[in-house]
Amino acid sequence: MEWLSQPAPLVAPALLGMVLVRQFADGLQVRAQIVETEAYTAGDPACHAYRRKTQRNQVMFGPPGHLYIYRIYGLYHCLNIVTEPEGIPAAVLIRAAQLDRLPDWIPANKQNQPARAAAGPGLLCQALRIDGSHNGWRLERAEAGQEGIWLEGSPSWQTQLSIVQTTRIGITQGAEIPWRWYIGGHPAVSRY
């Protein structure tokens, strides 16, 4: 997946329609079609690495194809895929996805609205049971009996999707930058 070494604003829309696979040690796999993304890069005031490299954001500095997981509001985890060549801090936030199945740990109030089970970055991580322990993981297919997280499918520039580009949401700095993409009309896009 060398294409992940491109700038985050190119990778973010390309991830739409691809499938994020989460494999658990017991062999269970949950697939989530990516329907919404946001890009964050060096020089962007909303980027966690805007000021400097820290222990918290060091994964953003590469190499590309690794996971940058952080917690927001002290409650929810967010999943990002690191992009750009090593040394340049950048990542794509996976804001929302459509699950192929609802695991039994999904709360009952989400069972009647399956498209909404991962319709936001915190919900996505809850649905895939991704937390801070996954920070720094490499996106790669796991062998049977091992945990793993990887991508399947082709970048969206190779498919026919109705992609909408707009400004990012839920941030106070850099909110005017149009680095949010989503699949138009998809029921799993976050409502933020």
From Swiss-Prot:
- Which processes are annotated in GO (biological process)? base-excision repair
Q: Which domain of life is it from?
A: Bacteria
The EC number on file is 3.2.2.-
The protein's GO terms of the molecular function aspect are: alkylbase DNA N-glycosylase activity; DNA binding
- Keywords in UniProt for this one? DNA damage, DNA repair, Hydrolase
PANTHER family attached to this UniProt entry: DNA-3-METHYLADENINE GLYCOSYLASE
Protein family per UniProt? Belongs to the DNA glycosylase MPG family.
What name does UniProt use for this protein?
Putative 3-methyladenine DNA glycosylase
Query: Which species does this protein come from?
Result: Synechococcus sp. (strain JA-2-3B'a(2-13)) (Cyanobacteria bacterium Yellowstone B-Prime)
Q: What is the lineage of its organism?
A: Bacteria, Bacillati, Cyanobacteriota, Cyanophyceae, Synechococcales
